[in-house]
């Protein structure tokens, strides 16, 4: 069993690995280059709106078993809130049409047989047309696998896959899309109940993990950026953090490298990583939602794609947002607010707002970029990779992050037992 494990990076994948290892009884040191944990999944106080906001609006589903188990392990599962049933409200802005997708509460997609539960103007046959995704390889395009037109595609498949893959769906990997469909629509309503970190991502998924790690051992050291790895034969022998700050590894010690692909490639020359990334744009408005407004609304035909109603604010998410990263902020905020007023049925002047543009939010989930994702094992027998950009079998999601951290931790534990 490894005596000590050094986890490099305190994003979700790093925290998941660290929690799993610490609970297994190992001494775990977490080294984070920034002054805050969470990576791209974090909250902070924004002076412009006067609110604590998330850098991105992340949606979990009840079928995200790894993420939900992670929250349960750190004692915050109750902080993931959502409706009792798997129901999603949608609005088609150009058609001025609203509907509610009702996925039921079972393990089978029986909702497909109820016209009142399906997307309007769709038949069971339309959904059967998605079946080729289930056995498609990751090397195949979605656009070459299913029909990318019609009511079902426009009103459900496109928004679902756009949010999951963060690329225009026809150019996305059919295999990754198939994984999403298998774990959501095909898994029945029991797996599709939407869950939101109502009190913020940091409060629910990050800070409790940091506190638990501190209670169990050395915890997280912030502002501690790994500068180089020193090899010793077929293993990593030392970690260099700059100057004389060097950590020498014992013969049974291990390292989990849970950093973004750029620093990972810098630390491991020759490591192949995805090279193309796509932006996600989020906007937050200091305006309490009207009574009875759904916590989540999918939007068709607008700039807004998903509208989140938090107790004290309205927030939107726009995926594959490269086209908006250089748009004038004031103009973009006004355009988004105008759509929010239509969606929420309100009439109000533009409230205090903030635009958050994550330019490299996720790797582009295309066949070519997916092929560049590395597995967790490296050329060094005591060094393992974690991150949503590694080869998890899923797009870049919180669920993928947690699974990758768990996988790296399990490899460390297995090596210790060998």
Swiss-Prot record:
GO terms for molecular function: oxidoreductase activity. Its EC number is 1.17.8.1. It holds the Pfam family Amino_oxidase. It is an enzyme of class 1 (oxidoreductase). Involved in the biosynthesis of the hopanoid precursor squalene (SQ) from farnesyl diphosphate (FPP). Catalyzes the third (last) step, the reduction of hydroxysqualene (HSQ) to SQ. The lineage of its organism: Bacteria, Pseudomonadati, Pseudomonadota, Alphaproteobacteria, Hyphomicrobiales. The gene is hpnE. Belongs to the HpnE family. It catalyses: squalene + FAD + H2O + H(+) = hydroxysqualene + FADH2. Keywords: FAD, Flavoprotein, Oxidoreductase. This is Hydroxysqualene dehydroxylase. Pathway: Secondary metabolite biosynthesis; hopanoid biosynthesis.
């Amino acid at each position: 069993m490894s005596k000590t494990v050094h986890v490099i990076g305190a994003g979700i994948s790093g925290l998941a690995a660290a929690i799993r290892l610490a609970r297994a009884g190992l001494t775990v040191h977490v080294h984070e280059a920034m002054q805050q944990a969470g990576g791209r999944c974090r909250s902070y106080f924004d002076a412009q709106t006067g609110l604590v906001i998330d850098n991105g609006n992340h949606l979990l589903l009840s079928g995200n078993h790894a993420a939900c188990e992670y929250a349960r392990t750190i004692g915050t599962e109750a902080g993931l809130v959502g409706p009792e049933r798997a129901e999603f409200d949608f609005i088609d802005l150009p058609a001025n049409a609203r509907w509610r997708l009702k996925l039921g509460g079972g393990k089978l997609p029986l909702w497909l047989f109820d016209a009142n539960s399906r997307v309007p103007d769709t038949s069971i046959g339309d959904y059967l047309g998605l079946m080729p995704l289930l056995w498609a390889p990751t090397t195949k395009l979605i656009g070459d696998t299913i029909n990318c037109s019609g009511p079902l595609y426009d009103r459900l498949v496109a928004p679902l896959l756009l949010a999951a893959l963060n690329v225009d769906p026809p150019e996305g990997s059919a295999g990754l899309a198939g994984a999403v469909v298998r774990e959501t629509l095909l898994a029945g309503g029991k797996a599709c109940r939407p869950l939101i970190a109502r009190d913020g991502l940091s409060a629910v998924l990050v800070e409790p993990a940091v506190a638990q790690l501190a209670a169990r051992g050395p915890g997280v050291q912030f502002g501690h950026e790994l500068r180089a790895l020193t090899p010793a034969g077929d293993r990593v022998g030392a970690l260099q953090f700059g100057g004389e700050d060097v950590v020498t590894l014992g013969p049974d010690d291990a390292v989990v490298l849970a950093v973004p692909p750029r620093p990972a490639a810098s630390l491991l020359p020759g490591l192949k990583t995805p090279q193309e990334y796509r932006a996600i744009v989020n906007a937050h408005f200091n305006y309490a939602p009207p009574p009875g407004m759904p916590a989540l609304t999918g939007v068709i035909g607008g700039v807004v794609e998903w509208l989140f109603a938090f107790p004290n604010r309205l927030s939107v998410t726009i995926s594959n947002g490269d086209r908006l990263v250089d748009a004038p902020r004031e103009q973009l905020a006004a355009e988004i607010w105008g759509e929010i007023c239509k969606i929420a049925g309100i009439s109000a002047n533009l409230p205090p707002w903030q635009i958050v543009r994550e330019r490299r939010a996720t790797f582009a989930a295309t066949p070519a970029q997916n092929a560049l994702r590395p597995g967790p094992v490296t050329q060094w027998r005591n060094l393992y990779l974690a991150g949503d950009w590694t080869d998890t079998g899923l797009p870049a999601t919180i669920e993928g992050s947690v699974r990758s951290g768990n996988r790296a931790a399990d490899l460390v534990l297995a090596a210790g037992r060998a």
